[in-house]
């Protein structure tokens, strides 16, 4: 389904995939669990440095999921940078930087998405107003070569508002098709 960010690996279900971001296990990596008209996945592509995907035979440190492991590494910035992206379905912004002595690094990403234009083609006519927003921050402080502290934070706001106006449903067989129209 192209409206979902969930994925299924052969031999398993979508909830049997393990997702790690910078060695933090993400327990509910998809912000909307229904699988339809979904918002944003937890992983923000503007912040990603590496992606490792295993579909079997992965290390024991990854635990007990059956299908796959998606291990994502976020960037370790060395200088100030950023990006802005805009499309018909949403927008994204990211900033990254490091202190002069490179002990403190930070990544901040914000995204907004709306499937409103795609949903207008649904058989149920009405006013669709889906809005998905998230902000992620990753801060790392390195005390010395052996000690460092890293924190990741995530804020998400997902709203799906729908005011139905009418629906037309077609059913039956090819030579006896019936339509039901509801206002």
Segments (PLM) and residue ranges:
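Extracytoplasmic beta-strand/coil segments of soluble accessory domains associated
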Residues: 1-28
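Membrane-spanning beta-strands of outer-membrane beta-barrel proteins
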Residues: 2, 88-90, 132, 180-182
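Extracytoplasmic
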Residues: 4, 14-16, 46-48, 65-69, ...
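Short acidic/polar hinge/loop motifs at secondary-structure boundaries
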Residues: 25-53
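Predominantly transmembrane beta-strands of Gram-negative outer membrane beta-barrel pores used
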Residues: 50-61, 67-75, 81-126, 134-142, ...
């Amino acid at each position: 389904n192209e409206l979902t960010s969930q994925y299924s690996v052969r031999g398993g279900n979508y909830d049997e995939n393990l997702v790690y971001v910078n060695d933090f296990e993400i327990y509910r990596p998809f912000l909307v669990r229904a699988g339809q008209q979904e918002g944003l996945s937890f992983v923000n592509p503007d912040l990603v440095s590496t992606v490792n995907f295993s579909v079997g035979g992965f290390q024991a440190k990854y635990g007990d999921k059956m299908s796959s492991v998606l291990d994502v590494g976020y960037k370790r910035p060395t200088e100030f940078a950023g990006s802005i992206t805009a499309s018909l379905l949403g927008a994204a912004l990211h900033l990254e930087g490091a202190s002069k002595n490179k002990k403190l690094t930070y990544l901040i990403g914000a995204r907004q998405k709306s499937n409103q234009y795609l949903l207008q083609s649904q058989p149920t006519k009405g006013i669709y107003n889906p809005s998905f927003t998230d902000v992620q921050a990753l801060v790392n402080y390195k005390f010395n070569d052996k000690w460092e502290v890293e924190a990741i934070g995530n804020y998400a706001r997902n709203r799906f508002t729908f005011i139905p106006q009418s629906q037309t449903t077609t059913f039956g067989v090819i030579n006896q098709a019936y339509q039901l129209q509801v206002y």
